[in-house]
């Protein structure tokens, strides 16, 4: 079902980083009512730029680390709901690429995403009288086929795809729909230099960037198109400037 972003309230976790910032720029062009950015480090210049692109959109920043206990996330969301009354879309975009930091990679890329999603269900779940909502989780093409030199990062992205696919199937119960956007190799600071697991490939970043990549802006444009297409359960691949819905192969079914 097509979705218009005009006059909507969007909460964007990590909306100031590489792909995140370019996506935020595309979002404000869609005449949102509110764009609420939750990020670890404030960037006043970026916030000012977003406001200048479309002064009609209210852009608000809250400091947020996705690794905090879920109770703190719920408290922050309560503040945001009190101010906006409604939130239409949650974008979970926090991510790091450094397989030296095993625990933090899992905490940021997966656990934090799960916790933020779980927290907003307190407000959205129709079983609690909530209105439902839309969750857009940022995965990666490494969730389809791993970059084997960074198995921890790739594993977290595979987990995001599976978690989000489960959320989509739960939509009739919760009223909350969900899908993933999965960028291919995109020219951002994230991939300029990073560590492989156990240093199995010291030149992993250089070797990766020797292959075709896409600019962050092209990825961001397709990111927003995916939001507007609003297909519950979609697994979007955003690679080399294209947007494609992946048809996942089923090799097993629980039968329940």
UniProtKB/Swiss-Prot annotation:
Substrate binds at residue 140. GO terms for molecular function: alcohol dehydrogenase (NAD+) activity. This is Alcohol dehydrogenase. Homodimer. The keyword Oxidoreductase applies. It is an enzyme of class 1 (oxidoreductase). The active site is at residue 153. Keywords: NAD, Oxidoreductase. Its EC number is 1.1.1.1. Belongs to the short-chain dehydrogenases/reductases (SDR) family. GO terms for cellular component: cytosol. PANTHER family: ALCOHOL DEHYDROGENASE. One of its GO terms (biological process) is alcohol metabolic process. It catalyses: a primary alcohol + NAD(+) = an aldehyde + NADH + H(+); a secondary alcohol + NAD(+) = a ketone + NADH + H(+). NAD(+) binds at residues 12-35. Pfam families: adh_short (PF00106). InterPro entries: ADH_Drosophila-type, NAD(P)-bd_dom_sf, Sc_DH/Rdtase_CS, SDR_fam. The lineage of its organism: Eukaryota, Metazoa, Ecdysozoa, Arthropoda, Hexapoda.
